[in-house]
Amino acid sequence: MEVEKSKSRHEIREERADYEGSPVREHRDGRRKEKDHRSKDKEKDYDREKIRDKDHRRDKEKERDRKRSRDEDTEKEISRGRDKEREKDKSRDRVKEKDKEKERNRHKDRENERDNEKEKDKDRARVKERASKKSHEDDDETHKAAERYEHSDNRGLNEGGDNVDAASSGKEASALDLQNRILKMREERKKKAEDASDALSWVARSRKIEEKRNAEKQRAQQLSRIFEEQDNLNQGENEDGEDGEHLSGVKVLHGLEKVVEGGAVILTLKDQSVLTDGDVNNEIDMLENVEIGEQKRRNEAYEAAKKKKGIYDDKFNDDPGAEKKMLPQYDEAATDEGIFLDAKGRFTGEAEKKLEELRKRIQGQTTHTFEDLNSSAKVSSDYFSQEEMLKFKKPKKKKQLRKKDKLDLSMLEAEAVASGLGAEDLGSRKDGRRQAMKEEKERIEYEKRSNAYQEAIAKADEASRLLRREQVQPFKRDEDESMVLADDAEDLYKSLEKARRLALIKKEEAGSGPQAVAHLVASSTNQTTDDNTTTGDETQENTVVFTEMGDFVWGLQRENDVRKPESEDVFMEEDVAPKAPVEVKEEHPDGLTEVNDTDMDAAEDSSDTKEITPDENIHEVAVGKGLSGALKLLKDRGTLKEKVEWGGRNMDKKKSKLVGIVDDDGGKESKDKESKDRFKDIRIERTDEFGRTLTPKEAFRLLSHKFHGKGPGKMKEEKRMKQYQEELKLKQMKNSDTPSQSVQRMREAQAQLKTPYLVLSGHVKPGQTSDPQSGFATVEKDVPGSLTPMLGDRKVEHFLGIKRKSEPGNSDTPPKRPKP
């Protein structure tokens, strides 16, 4: 900052005193300098303070930002810690839940163990009760035997005393027997008490055997019920008179064993596609159970997952019993266990035999296989029979061709009569005459066209000959010869112009006068055709018409000039006549402009000043006498091959892909010495069906296709053929033509129509007619009527058939105002 101070009176006095004496002046100057230094020091101090304040503020802002970042970091850490704590809590909860589940399972196991122990205790108590009962029964039996023995002894004592000695001896023997019996019984009781644990195991075994027997009985009962239900169903069908013909030839996808296991099984039609290979699916209908099918697929997936991978399989094993396999992906699928139904919708003989065997197994009967010795067994042979060959071959599907329904003329006539059509139109005698007149008109028009075409061709030939003479001769001419030829050409052009003018005068005289007017009034019906033909002749002989065809040809010429400018110096076999300068005469409402030729003198001047170049776009390039022209033509046609023509994909034809296969031309001399020392490499070249050398990748693809037996698809083959044909067309086409041969087609259409022009309109207008052979539209004709009323000269021209030449001064319609 600059410190501004107002000057005081004292300073003014000091300034005045400066001029009075020099010492005072010096003193004042010193004081001023000191003041200036002080003010500068103050300003510097002020600036320093400002800078310090700014630095202080910046430091404060940085500290604030650091605090904010620290706070954010702390918040993030806190949130992370919370998330970690939540995850830990969740993991703890999961562990607790798992522990609880384990405790529950333990409690359940303990309860089950307790129940099992209780059942075992009950079984032991039952066994003990049974053993005690048996011991009590044995004691009772011993007591009863002792009582009987004592009773018998008492009887013997009462009967007689004579036999006392015999009785005493008998008592001693009986007492010994009783003691022995009692000892045996006691030993048996001890053994039974010891074998109590063995009895429990015996009880468990007996229970399992009983359960198995009960399960077999239940299964046998279920199967018997199933067979009874099937028999009842068959009997009911036979009683009702219903047939199973609608199930004839149907295939059941499941085997009998799986169907019989589950009892009554519901079978449904398997989902199949309606169309196969663009035709109706005529395969056999199949029945399946959804649950059995899903279970079968699960089992197959499980078996496939169980297969071990990476195991060495000896493919060259000579064991005749071993199954030989090539690759696992080419293994044949397992045989399908299906059953076919016969014509009546029942099981076949083989299926019935299997059913009988299953019934016998269920009932427990022995299944003996009986062989019929009288039956002629099938002998296995190494060759197929005719029937087996027919089965082995894949049956071809018959293509269903659509047939057109024949028209029933009698039915159509009856319908027409019923609807009232054809009742009024009974024909007339003049139909034949009208047809003959129509054919005659068409013939006359055709002759006129052909004559005009021949005249145009003759004129073009004459002009081209003159041009050829002018173009070939000027190379080696003297000035005198050129002057003579110029005079001859001038005389020829003048004579041609006079002939044209005489022809026009004759036509105008023939088309004017009272007789011509009367003739035109009499032939008013054919005035449109006559008018068109006369105007057509006039335009062909005296005028030039600019059409879309001319613009199209001009565009073609410009394209070819841009594409191949180097062939301009080659002369063609046939040349077109030079274009004469034209001037616009009048413009018709249909968009065509009529142009007349100018004086021939101006044409001659222009021909002298400009050299006419031959047309290179219409005709083929001349080869000439030299070898370079022939080589160039062969190169353009594709018959001369500079390099190897590769067959394959475009990416495989790159130089980077063919390194080392084809050597470059450069550096041959330097490589000659190295190639002599090296061994010659063996190169195998394969060609495709078109004779082109295959690239290495394409050759490998072909070999792999042959090995695997799987070639490219139909669409790829068609694309490849189409690409090759396009390349062939590009090589063989003419320089002036396109691959679609549009120029050649244009010439063919002109030859058929016999006209030197073509109308390239997209659609046929009301006043035009289309040629049925070429499809091109002809020149437009004047439509006789329109929506606007005809007045004045236009009305007279229409009814009298006269075409007046418009004069610039005589115009009925006023000129249009220009748009602002």
Swiss-Prot record:
One GO-annotated biological process of the protein: leaf development
Subcellular location: Nucleus
Keywords, alphabetical: Coiled coil, Developmental protein, Nucleus, Phosphoprotein
Entry comment describing in which tissues the protein is expressed: Expressed in lateral root cap, columella, meristem and quiescent center (QC). Expressed in young leaves.
InterPro entries (alphabetical): SNU66/SART1
Residue positions where Phosphoserine is found in the record: S22
Regions of compositional bias (Polar residues) in chain numbering: 733-744, 767-776
Biased composition (Low complexity): 525-543
Residue ranges of coiled coil: 58-120, 171-235, 433-510
UniProt cross-references to Pfam families, sorted A to Z: SART-1
Biased composition (Acidic residues): 596-606
Predominant location: nucleus
GO cellular component annotations of the record: nucleolus; nucleus
Disruption phenotype: Dwarf plants with variable number of cotyledons, short petioles in leaves and impaired flowering. Defects in venation pattern in leaves.
Source taxon at top rank: Eukaryota
Chloroplast found in the keyword field: no
Span list, region Disordered: 1-177, 210-248, 420-445, 523-544, 564-617, 657-678, 729-748, 762-820
Start-end of Basic and acidic residues biased regions: 1-156, 210-219, 426-445, 582-591, 607-617, 665-678, 792-807
Function: Plays a role in root, shoot and flower development. Probably required for normal root and shoot meristem organization and maintenance and the proper expression of PIN and PLT genes. Involved in leaf vasculature patterning.
Similarity field: Belongs to the SNU66/SART1 family.
Name assigned to this protein: SART-1 family protein DOT2
Organism: Arabidopsis thaliana
